Amino acid sequence: MKAIVQVRGEVNQEQGVRDTLEMLNLDRVNHATLVPETDAYDGMVTKVNDWVAHGEPSADVVATLIERRAEPAAGEGDIDDEWVADNTDYDGVEALAEALVDEETTLQEAGVSPTLRLHPPRGGHDGIKHPTKEGGQLGKHTTEEIDTLLEAMR
């Protein structure tokens, strides 16, 4: 599973990039989504690589994101262990996070909104104009790097 975070805005975006971000359920800066690792999603991520940060997060970070930032797809409320037990096949947030990381389910299948609206990163971005190889935020991150970014945006 990959976490994809939109880091850059719409200025100077081509229409194809905008359409791809919309297909990924990313319509604003600092929004994130969790997608399975398939060829179709890999192609989409390649296309929007200059606008997003992406990587494979750990289950602990996914659980934190679900508890703090996830919203039910229908209705309002917070996602906690009780909500997960009542509305999904899983016992709690940790079990749902493990299932997401293992690609047993998706956010939509679990009844959770596919878009996670995150806070801007505490301490700021490392740079939204440069890829990770040059010390920026754009492109592919290691598990530790994406975990650090998502923790800062929790």
From Swiss-Prot:
Keyword Ribosomal protein in record: yes
Q: Where is this region: Disordered?
A: 114-139
> What keywords are annotated for this sequence in UniProt?
Ribonucleoprotein, Ribosomal protein
**Any single biological process term in GO:** maturation of LSU-rRNA from tricistronic rRNA transcript (SSU-rRNA, 5.8S rRNA, LSU-rRNA)
Q: Per the record, where are the segments of Basic and acidic residues compositional bias?
A: 123-133
Source organism, top-level taxon: Archaea
Q: Which InterPro entries match?
A: Ribo_uL30_ferredoxin-like_sf, Ribosomal_uL30, Ribosomal_uL30_arc, Ribosomal_uL30_euk_arc, Ribosomal_uL30_ferredoxin-like
Query: Which GO MF terms are attached to this record?
Result: RNA binding; structural constituent of ribosome
Q: Name one GO cellular component term.
A: cytosolic large ribosomal subunit
Q: What PANTHER family does UniProt report for this protein, alphabetically?
A: 60S RIBOSOMAL PROTEIN L7, LARGE RIBOSOMAL SUBUNIT PROTEIN UL30
Q: Which HAMAP family match?
A: Ribosomal_uL30_A
Assembly: Part of the 50S ribosomal subunit.
What family is reported? Belongs to the universal ribosomal protein uL30 family.
> What's the name of the protein?
Large ribosomal subunit protein uL30
Species:
Natronomonas pharaonis (strain ATCC 35678 / DSM 2160 / CIP 103997 / JCM 8858 / NBRC 14720 / NCIMB 2260 / Gabara) (Halobacterium pharaonis)
UniProt lineage? Archaea, Methanobacteriati, Methanobacteriota, Stenosarchaea group, Halobacteria
What gene is this protein a product of? rpl30
